[in-house]
């Protein structure tokens, strides 16, 4: 198993990063939240999980070991593959998923693309004794609410966009962030900002 990759960020895409390790570019699938912490040309270290299939080897990257562990635990539930597990972590931080499972919060799980009401109920049953109790801060996105503009702007600059483009994209998604109330999700805002920029080009 490849436990982590450490090296220079050679490229960034909406759903992946390329980390140069010893002259080799390692393509790593990441959530928008993880990608928002990376900068082109800067050193980075990502916890990783290698998913082996008959026709492919896919490396998934995470901000820390806890996120990777939750990613792997999610896949122990029937019907959850690496893509759905990553989608769950793109919408919710590890502690938010633990809290959702611990409290039986179907709505939190159905917020993930690909999970319906019945699927959420099944996951709540299967994951109840696997994820454990929340271990971190009390609320998902709580530290993000005041600084989402700075985080989103930095993420867009890290993806190679000009300062002017980043400014315009941040302004374009501001109504969406305000509609989310006190806990805007930077990952979701990054996706919306990238769509805005792609339409403008």
Swiss-Prot record:
GO molecular function: ATP binding; four-way junction DNA binding; four-way junction helicase activity
Chain positions covered by the region annotation Domain II: 64-139
Subcellular location: Cytoplasm
Region annotation Domain I: where it falls in the sequence: 1-63
InterPro entries in alphabetical order: DNA_helicase_Holl-junc_RuvA_I, Hlx-hairpin-Hlx_DNA-bd_motif, NA-bd_OB-fold, RuvA, RuvA_2-like, RuvA_C, RuvA_C_sf
Cellular component, GO annotation: cytoplasm; Holliday junction helicase complex; Holliday junction resolvase complex
Region of interest (Flexible linker), residue spans: 139-143
Gene3D superfamilies per UniProt: 5' to 3' exonuclease, C-terminal subdomain, DNA helicase RuvA subunit, C-terminal domain, Nucleic acid-binding proteins
Family: Belongs to the RuvA family.
Domain remarks in the Swiss-Prot or TrEMBL record: Has three domains with a flexible linker between the domains II and III and assumes an 'L' shape. Domain III is highly mobile and contacts RuvB.
Record's function text: The RuvA-RuvB-RuvC complex processes Holliday junction (HJ) DNA during genetic recombination and DNA repair, while the RuvA-RuvB complex plays an important role in the rescue of blocked DNA replication forks via replication fork reversal (RFR). RuvA specifically binds to HJ cruciform DNA, conferring on it an open structure. The RuvB hexamer acts as an ATP-dependent pump, pulling dsDNA into and through the RuvAB complex. HJ branch migration allows RuvC to scan DNA until it finds its consensus sequence, where it cleaves and resolves the cruciform DNA.
UniProt protein name: Holliday junction branch migration complex subunit RuvA
Organism whose genome encodes this protein: Streptomyces coelicolor (strain ATCC BAA-471 / A3(2) / M145)
């Amino acid at each position: 198993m490849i436990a982590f990759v450490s090296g220079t960020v050679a490229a960034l895409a909406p759903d992946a990063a390329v980390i140069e390790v010893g002259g080799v570019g390692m393509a790593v699938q990441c959530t928008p939240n993880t990608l928002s912490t990376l900068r082109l040309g800067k050193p980075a270290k990502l916890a990783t999980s290698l998913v082996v299939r008959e026709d492919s080897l896919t490396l998934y990257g995470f901000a820390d070991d806890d996120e990777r562990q939750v990613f792997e635990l999610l896949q122990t539930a029937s019907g959850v593959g690496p893509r759905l597990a990553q989608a769950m972590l793109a919408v919710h931080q590890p502690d938010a998923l633990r809290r959702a499972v611990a409290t039986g919060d179907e709505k939190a799980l159905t917020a993930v693309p690909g999970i319906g009401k019945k699927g959420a109920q099944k996951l709540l049953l299967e994951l109840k004794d696997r994820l454990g109790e929340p271990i971190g801060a009390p609320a998902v996105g709580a530290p993000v609410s005041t600084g989402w503009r700075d985080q989103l702007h930095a993420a867009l600059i890290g993806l190679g966009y000009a300062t002017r483009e980043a400014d315009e994209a941040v302004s374009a998604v501001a109504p969406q962030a305000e509609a989310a109330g006190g806990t805007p999700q930077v990952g979701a805002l990054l996706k919306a900002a990238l769509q805005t920029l792609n339409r403008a080009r």
